[in-house]
A protein has these predicted regions:
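P-loop NTPase catalytic phosphate-binding loop
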Residues: 1-10, 58-60, 82, 89-93, ...
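Solvent-exposed amphipathic alpha-helical surface segments
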Residues: 43, 240, 244-247, 390, ...
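A detector of tandemly repeated sequence units and domain arrays
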Residues: 251-254, 432-433
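Conserved short loop/turn motifs at secondary-structure junctions
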Residues: 67, 312-313, 471-476
Length: 509
């Protein structure tokens, strides 16, 4: 067991880069305002540009609808819908890739016409973390999101969300957003205050965080382990509720105030799942049930979910999942149908990509458009390097290797009970840290009483899959996955096939 280490927070100003500031030429803005007014007038929907808000990627032109003379000689204000329908005509007149019309702008008596800038400016994480909008949030889980169209920094409190759903196509900035949120949290919390559970089926986005002391276990990349991860998180949530009841605490903040000085504080858990689509294709019913239960109940225990997907379809983001994730971020998507799946309204299909996003807050009636913060690979490397170096410096030269080994086999004392496992031939990072012996039928030595029956079953059917064992043996997902792993180790079945195809039975007696 590793000795307790007292960690120190980094100076984030030394680890992050400053953003670049690009001012839009005033003459260009005036010319675009003139074109907007002339175009509206030519379609019998006159309006006057009363406000111009240049942003890092787009500029918002605030248009106040004008009046038309009726046949009776009375003045009648132009309908907001008349302006909103002219988005394609305005884009043509302005020679813009696409424009988005917000009709009306919430809290203002004007219609917002959002036009892309000729040059794009990056929004740095450092600039948002130094802004008053970020610093005045009193929470350990405050996150920097980006700059709104009017140039206002946008930050949010993850504990208030309390979970976040992120969706967008490839190249839209979704993965950068996830990394920016993780980086922001790492810069504000020690491993005693915050721990991560990361799931990365694509094996490219989150594996770089392996080795930091904030991880409950190395990043999970084995698709067949992910349901077990969610089941473990659910058990941890229930364990925390029992601890709350024992001392009369209402939530994690109340618990940490009431415990004695010699007791370990309960850390926040943030579960990051990089691609929901892979999991929904593998075990849709179990995934939906677990995510819904965690989203409904985990907030008080300090467990928060951040889930992203590049396939925002109704079979991936189901109604039950969406109902329990009121905080959502939509990046550029392919169609208005996909936008409705995420936000319940169109608009995301008109975003520009590369960090252009719509943030739907639980408190807001309408989504807010903004340019998301950008965190480079070099900045992430400096942040993870800081924590790894501190672990080695304070824990000894072998601390990093010991941490990975202990985490992999579930033997680190993190203030929770982790089931003991036998060491198998599977990679250490994917050991069954997440499994419960009582649920899997394991006797503590790695033997399962159903193993022989499972082998006989797959040999008779000449195929093997987790869902097959679940149906035929009437067992849970985790136990079935362990039986499949055991048979693969023993050379009875082959490796996983593409998609959801069953495995091949390769050995007969």
């Amino acid at each position: 067991m590793r000795r307790q280490i007292t960690y120190e927070l980094p100076d984030f100003r030394k680890l992050l880069n400053r953003g670049e500031e690009k001012r839009v030429n005033d003459e260009v803005l005036l010319e675009k305002a003139r074109i907007i007014e002339e175009t509206l007038a030519s379609f019998s929907a006159p309006g006057k540009v009363v406000e111009v808000n240049p942003g890092p990627v787009i500029t918002q032109f605030g248009v106040e609808p004008d009046y038309l003379l009726t046949r009776s000689g009375k003045k009648q204000r132009v309908k907001v819908g008349s302006i909103a329908r002219l988005d394609a005509d305005l884009a043509l007149a302005l020679a813009a890739k696409s424009i988005r019309i917000e009709a009306p702008v919430p809290g203002k008596s004007m219609v917002g016409i959002e036009v892309p800038n000729d040059e794009v400016a990056l929004v740095s994480l450092l600039d948002i973390m130094e802004a008053p909008e970020f610093t005045r949030i009193d929470s350990k889980l405050r996150i920097a999101l980006g700059l709104a169209v009017d140039g206002t920094p946008v930050a949010a409190d993850l504990t208030a969300m309390p979970h976040l759903l992120i969706a967008g196509t490839t190249g839209s900035g979704k993965s950068v957003c996830v990394n920016a949120i993780i980086a922001c949290l790492l810069l504000q919390n020690t491993p005693d205050d915050l721990q991560f559970i990361m799931v990365d089926p694509k094996r490219v986005e989150l594996t770089g965080y392996n080795g930091i002391p904030h991880l409950v276990a190395p990043v999970v990349v084995d698709l067949e382990r992910i349901v077990g991860v969610l089941q473990w998180v659910q058990r941890e949530m229930e364990t925390r509720y029992h601890k709350f009841a024992a001392i009369g605490a209402r939530n994690i903040l109340d618990y940490n105030k009431k415990i004695g000085p010699d007791q370990r504080r309960m850390p926040y858990y943030v579960v990051v799942i990089d691609e929901l689509a892979d999991l929904m294709m593998l075990a849709p019913d179990e995934t939906e049930r677990l995510l819904a239960r965690l989203a409904q109940m985990a907030r008080a225990t300090g467990i928060h979910l951040i889930i992203s997907t590049q396939r925002p379809s109704v079979d991936i983001i189901t109604g039950l999942i969406k109902a329990n994730f009121p905080a959502r971020i939509a990046f550029m998507v392919a169609s208005s149908v996909d936008s409705r799946v995420i936000l319940d309204q169109p608009g995301a299909e008109k975003l520009l990509g590369r960090g252009d996003m719509l943030f739907q807050s639980p408190e807001a009636a309408a989504p807010v458009r903004m340019q998301g913060v950008f965190v480079s690979d070099e900045e992430i490397a400096r942040i993870t390097g800081f924590w790894k170096a501190q672990l080695i410096q304070k824990g000894g030269p072998d601390a990093l290797a010991t941490t990975n080994r202990e985490l992999a086999f579930g033997s680190v004392d993190r203030g929770m009970e982790l089931p003991g496992r036998r060491r198998s031939s599977r990679p250490a990072a994917q050991q069954a840290l997440w499994e419960d012996p009582e649920l899997t039928g394991d006797d503590g030595m790695g033997e399962d009483e159903l193993y022989d029956q499972a082998v006989e079953l797959v040999r008779s059917l000449k195929k093997a899959s987790i869902s097959l064992l679940q149906r035929q043996l009437r067992i849970g997902y985790t136990r079935a996955a362990r039986l499949i792993d055991r048979m693969e180790e023993d050379g009875i079945i082959g490796p996983p096939q593409e998609g959801s195809k069953p495995r091949e039975v390769i050995k007969f007696d």
